[in-house]
């Protein structure tokens, strides 16, 4: 299975978790990691190139830190520009039908804060629903996300283990 990881962190060079994830995933021959902020420092996304890349892979992974209960802005811009009517959706937009979409998300807060009654009031599943809705619209199979909670409190060993677990997780088959 060919996997395309779109790593979207505006400060990847100083990131703790997302940088470790990208480095670990890059070690695998069937995984291509693209750092979108490095690829497009001016945010001028090459739509044709991105669409072609998406067509070449079986599974697409959006990797990002949770920013204001969503993704960093470049991922939203990427979706707005790349997932076009007639290509990704609409009566003739079937380029991604049958492919898989997965999210790899890191949060600053602990897991217990992402639930009813928790500090953030909503589960991570609820907060990520727009990605699931997008996946449904464009005919992709939405897979369970990989979430690493509590980056702000994580030990280096936990981060290293999370990178290895992520590599295993995104390569496993989902029925």
Curated annotation (Swiss-Prot):
Keyword annotations from UniProtKB, A to Z: Oxidoreductase, Stress response
Inducing factors: By heat shock, salt stress, oxidative stress, glucose limitation and oxygen limitation.
Organism name: Bacillus subtilis (strain 168)
Gene Ontology molecular function, alphabetical: electron transfer activity; FMN binding; NAD(P)H dehydrogenase (quinone) activity
Family, similarity comment: Belongs to the NAD(P)H dehydrogenase (quinone) family.
Lineage: Bacteria, Bacillati, Bacillota, Bacilli, Bacillales
Protein name stated in the entry: General stress protein 14
Family matches, as InterPro entries: Flavodoxin_fold (IPR003680), Flavoprotein-like_sf (IPR029039), KefG/KefF (IPR046980)
E.C. number(s) listed in UniProt: 1.6.99.-
